[in-house]
Amino acid sequence: MITAESEHKIAPWKIEEVNKLKELLKNGQIVALVDMMEVPARQLQEIRDKIRGTMTLKMSRNTLIERAIKEVAEETGNPEFAKLADYIDKGAAIITTDMNPFKLYKTLEESKSPAPIKGGAVAPCDIEVKAGSTGMPPGPFLGELKSVGIPAAIEKGKIGIKEDKVVAKAGEVVSHKLAVVLSALGIKPVTVGLNLLAAYEDGVIYTPDVLKIDEEEFVQKIQDAYSKAFNLSVNAAIPTAQTIETLLQKAFANARAVSIESAFLTEKTTDDILGKAYSQMLAVAREVGDDALDDELKEKLSTAVVETKAEVEEAKEEEKEEKKEEAAPAAAGLGLLF
């Protein structure tokens, strides 16, 4: 905390800046630190336009940001918040927002854009120059291409690149000469934007490795977990708001099956029990001789046989119709070949 004794040793503008940062930190629901050292002015303005209305971005010196964080932690009695200062690095800036840390990380990643690589920078990936016309007229640029190992020649009045060429592998330092050539060719191998250093919410500090998730995989895991929990609840007969309907349906089906199997007559099972008994009666009748059957039972048995034959014939006719319907499109398809 800046005391009255030490204030005269600190530039007034620094005291004012720390106070502004403290006010921002105290009012922020979610507080995050980002690194913006490598972001060019043009891309920074584009990022500001993209995030406007969803978050507040405040740039300042690292030392002042650190002081503001620690003073807010002391004034609010929140030692966990002070740990956020440990993540200050490079060209740090403060972001405050009401987005949860996961959405904040995703938003910042989506706001990034491709940019030319600078001389002396490390290639983030293999940088490849594709074969084809550069669209540039013959001139000194032809020599520049060759000087960095790119096979080039004049083709149809324009400078053309003869073949694909990897000019820098991932991890290699890009020379200033190569960086100029790549920029002239419009090759932008670098992605620039605000890199999240850490985000603070309700006593927890989130780092990028935690916030970077595969959304589709994450949703699938949640769905799988829900499905397993649902099945466990149903099989263990644990009623919940989500499973009560399924449990009642299962209980009803089980009770109905027991009632039918044990021939216990109820309003819901009488028809099924009588139907089952009738079928069993006919099955027994078929096994005994005609002499043991009365006329009424013989008539019922013959009627059942006729109905069964009719059902079989109807099924055969339906099968024939299905085959005809399947054959018609095939014949039409063959007709198109001739």
UniProtKB/Swiss-Prot annotation:
GO terms under biological process: cytoplasmic translation; ribosomal large subunit assembly
Annotated transmembrane regions: none
Keyword Ribonucleoprotein: yes
CDD domains: Ribosomal_P0_L10e
Keywords for this protein: Ribonucleoprotein, Ribosomal protein, RNA-binding, rRNA-binding
SUPFAM superfamilies noted in UniProt: Ribosomal protein L10-like
Pfam entry (one): RL10P_insert
GO molecular-function term, one example from the UniProt record: structural constituent of ribosome
Sequence segments annotated as region (Disordered): 309-338
InterPro entries with a match to the protein in the record: Ribosomal_protein_uL10, Ribosomal_uL10, Ribosomal_uL10-like_insert, Ribosomal_uL10-like_insert_sf, Ribosomal_uL10-like_sf, Ribosomal_uL10_arc
Biased composition (Basic and acidic residues): 309-327
Cellular compartments per GO CC: cytosolic large ribosomal subunit
Job description of the protein: Forms part of the ribosomal stalk, playing a central role in the interaction of the ribosome with GTP-bound translation factors.
UniProt record similarity statement: Belongs to the universal ribosomal protein uL10 family.
Subunit structure: Part of the 50S ribosomal subunit. Forms part of the ribosomal stalk which helps the ribosome interact with GTP-bound translation factors. Forms a heptameric L10(L12)2(L12)2(L12)2 complex, where L10 forms an elongated spine to which the L12 dimers bind in a sequential fashion.
Protein name: Large ribosomal subunit protein uL10
The species this protein was found in: Methanothermococcus thermolithotrophicus (Methanococcus thermolithotrophicus)
